[in-house]
C-alpha cells in the first residue's frame, strides 16, 4: 500500500473542501488516514485459501454453523463503512476448518473496498473451493453508512444478502435447517 500517495490525496481533499490543512486538528490527519487504511484494507494482501488450507479430518459430515461473526468493511462506491454480522453454515466433505478460520475468511473479504453482495458470494465460494465443502450457506446482515449519512439518509436500515452453494442450494430441507440454526 502506498501510504505516501494516500497522505497526499487526503491533504488535497482537506484543501479541496475548504479547510486549512495546517490547522492543529488536521495537521496529522493525512498520516492518520493512511495508517487507518492499512488496517481497514489489510485483506488486500491475503487469501482465504491460506486460512482454510489447514483443516481437520472428521468421521461424519454434519452441518457446521458459526453465527454472529461481526465484521466491518468499506463500501467501494462511497468509501464509507458498512458493518454487521455474518452467519455461515457448511456441510463438510470429510474435513472441517478451525472455527477461527471461518472468522478469518470473513475478514479477508471484508477488509478491502467491497460491496455486500460480493462479500457474501466470496465467503460461500471460498468454503466450496478451499475447504471442499459439500454445501455452503452465507447470510450477511449489515448497516451501510452510505445509506445512513448521505443520499436517502435512513439510519438503522439493514441489508440482508445470502449465497447458497452445493447441497445447501439444492436440498430445501437442509437449507431450511441451516436457516433455522442461524436463527432465521
UniProtKB/Swiss-Prot annotation:
Keyword flag Chloroplast: no
GO cellular component: cytoplasm
Residue sites binding Zn(2+) per the record: 75, 78, 146
Its EC number(s): 3.5.4.16
InterPro entries xrefs: GTP-CH-I_C/QueF, GTP-CH-I_N, GTP_CycHdrlase_I, GTP_CycHdrlase_I_CS, GTP_CycHdrlase_I_dom
Catalytic activity, reaction form: GTP + H2O = 7,8-dihydroneopterin 3'-triphosphate + formate + H(+)
GO biological process, one term: tetrahydrobiopterin biosynthetic process
Pathway this chain belongs to: Cofactor biosynthesis; 7,8-dihydroneopterin triphosphate biosynthesis; 7,8-dihydroneopterin triphosphate from GTP: step 1/1
EC class name: hydrolase
GO molecular function, one term: zinc ion binding
Keywords: GTP-binding, Hydrolase, Metal-binding, Nucleotide-binding, One-carbon metabolism, Zinc
Protein name: GTP cyclohydrolase 1
Amino acid at each position: 500500500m502506498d501510504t505516501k500517495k494516500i497522505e497526499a490525496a487526503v491533504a488535497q481533499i482537506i484543501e479541496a473542501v475548504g479547510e486549512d490543512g495546517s490547522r492543529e486538528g488536521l495537521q496529522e490527519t493525512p498520516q492518520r488516514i493512511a495508517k487507518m487504511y492499512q488496517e481497514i484494507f489489510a485483506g488486500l494482501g491475503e487469501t482465504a485459501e491460506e486460512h482454510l488450507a489447514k483443516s481437520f479430518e472428521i468421521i461424519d459430515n454434519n452441518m457446521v454453523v458459526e453465527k454472529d461473526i461481526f465484521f466491518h468493511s468499506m463500501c467501494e462506491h462511497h468509501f464509507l463503512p458498512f458493518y454487521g454480522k455474518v452467519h455461515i453454515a457448511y456441510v463438510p466433505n470429510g474435513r472441517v476448518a478451525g472455527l477461527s478460520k471461518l472468522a478469518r475468511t470473513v475478514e479477508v473479504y471484508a477488509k478491502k473496498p467491497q460491496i455486500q453482495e460480493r462479500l457474501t458470494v466470496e465467503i460461500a465460494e471460498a468454503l466450496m473451493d478451499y475447504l471442499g465443502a459439500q454445501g455452503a450457506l452465507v447470510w450477511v446482515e449489515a448497516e451501510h453508512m452510505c445509506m445512513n449519512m448521505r443520499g436517502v439518509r435512513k439510519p438503522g436500515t439493514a441489508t440482508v444478502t445470502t449465497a447458497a452453494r452445493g447441497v445447501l442450494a439444492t436440498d430445501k430441507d437442509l437449507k431450511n435447517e441451516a436457516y433455522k440454526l442461524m436463527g432465521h
